[in-house]
């Protein structure tokens, strides 16, 4: 089973990923940010989105697909999916930061690949943080390449995530309030229950309010 963690930049995806790893028997797959940083692609993208949008989004899509294609058997918790890459590409196009030709090429490539991998994207945890909280967290963590991300950009990405995930009946989705998330046994119980990961030794409490 594959479970993808989706959410805005700064929503807390990596933190939740590692917390799940400590409490549920699973394999984890983190977003390959370090690969993008090695070639300075993340920093270049946020400094000049129009120039680097197509290059960055194609690279993200390819590197993420390679990871998904090599997942082990069992339960896999994966930071983002190929579908969230399409959100960022769509936002670039809507803001005239990606040309129509570039966007059409991206969609053609992503559609073909998505059809091959869509069966693997059936379970999603949506960490839903408000744009302001995401913005503050980004400033606090001070990750290389993210210092130029404006609040307006996070608001746009937040809106697209909501449009995709809040009323999507095709995917098994757990929506979590990421602004006030407490990392404790309760949230693990909710995740186990939602995605049928319980075993006979589990004693659970699912009276959890998001």
Regions found by a protein language model. Give the residues of each.
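Conserved lysine of the Walker
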Residues: 13
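A glycine- and Lys/Arg-enriched "phosphate-lid" helix/loop adjacent to the NTP-binding pocket
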Residues: 88-159
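Conserved substrate/cofactor phosphate-moiety recognition/catalytic segment
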Residues: 22-63
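Post-Walker A alpha-helix
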Residues: 16-17
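P-loop (Walker A) phosphate-binding loop of NTP-binding proteins
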Residues: 8
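NTP-dependent small-molecule kinase module
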Residues: 135-210
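A basic- and aromatic-enriched beta-loop-alpha substructure that forms the phosphate/nucleotide-
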Residues: 63-101, 125
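Hydrophobic anchor at the beta1->P-loop junction of P-loop NTPases
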Residues: 5
């Amino acid at each position: 089973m594959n479970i993808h963690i989706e959410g805005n930049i700064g929503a807390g995806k990596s933190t939740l990923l590692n917390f799940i790893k400590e409490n549920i028997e699973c394999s984890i797959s983190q977003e390959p940010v370090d690969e993008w940083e090695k070639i300075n692609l993340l920093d270049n993208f946020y400094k000049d989105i129009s120039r680097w949008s197509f290059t960055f989004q194609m690279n993200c899509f390819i590197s993420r697909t390679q990871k998904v294609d090599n997942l082990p058997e069992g339960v896999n918790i994966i930071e983002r999916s190929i579908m969230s890459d399409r959100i960022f590409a769509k936002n670039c196009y809507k803001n005239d930061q990606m040309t129509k030709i570039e966007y059409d090429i991206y969609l053609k490539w992503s559609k073909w690949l998505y059809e091959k991998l869509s069966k693997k994207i059936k379970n999603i945890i949506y960490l839903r943080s408000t744009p302001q909280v995401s913005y503050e967290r980004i400033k606090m963590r001070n990750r290389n390449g993210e210092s130029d991300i404006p609040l307006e950009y996070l608001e746009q990405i937040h809106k697209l995530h909501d449009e995709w995930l809040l009323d999507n009946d095709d995917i098994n989705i757990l929506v979590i309030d990421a602004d006030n998330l407490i990392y404790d046994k309760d949230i693990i119980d909710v995740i186990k229950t939602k995605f049928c990961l319980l075993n006979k030794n589990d004693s659970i409490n699912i009276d959890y309010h998001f």
